[in-house]
Amino acid sequence: MMASKRVAKELESLSKELPPYLRQLSSDDANVLVWHMLLLPDQLPYGLKAFQVRIDFPREYPFKPPTLRFTTKIYHPNVREDGLVCLPLISNENWKPYTKPYQVLEALNVLVSKPNLEEPVRLELADLLTQNPEMFRKKAEEFTLKFGVDRPS
């Protein structure tokens, strides 16, 4: 119950001052512990479209970290094929109970533009980005145009 109240309060607070890279922030009607939003990266190759993202807060929040998942496919070395995001800030070993959702979303926005090649979950994409950045960008752009969501105006 404590998690639901805190998450509802943080959702309300974030909704009032939505950063420019986020749109359509909402929670499930039946469950405030599940948030949905549209991420609008500002740099290529991902800046051509938008991506739907889901945050799941555990019942033990804030003592356990939320999970982040792209529900729109994205070609990225730190995002598994099922959409789960590998973000050091929300790993069990790095999580701090005072971390706010807006900090997690800011870290996600940075990660999309600047992949963390120290901790990739898709090694083949990290290798391609390291060895042939132009080919990686071309493939990421094609993937973004194929699967990304139209950006709201």
Swiss-Prot record:
It catalyses: S-ubiquitinyl-[E1 ubiquitin-activating enzyme]-L-cysteine + [E2 ubiquitin-conjugating enzyme]-L-cysteine = [E1 ubiquitin-activating enzyme]-L-cysteine + S-ubiquitinyl-[E2 ubiquitin-conjugating enzyme]-L-cysteine. It is an enzyme of class 2 (transferase). ISGylated. The keyword Manganese does not apply. Residues 2-149 form the UBC core domain. InterPro entries: Ub_conjugating_enzyme, UBQ-conjugat_E2_core, UBQ-conjugating_AS, UBQ-conjugating_enzyme/RWD. One of its GO terms (molecular function) is ATP binding. Pathway: Protein modification; protein ubiquitination. Its EC number is 2.3.2.23. Gene3D superfamilies: Ubiquitin Conjugating Enzyme. Belongs to the ubiquitin-conjugating enzyme family. This is Ubiquitin/ISG15-conjugating enzyme E2 L6. The lineage of its organism: Eukaryota, Metazoa, Chordata, Craniata, Vertebrata.
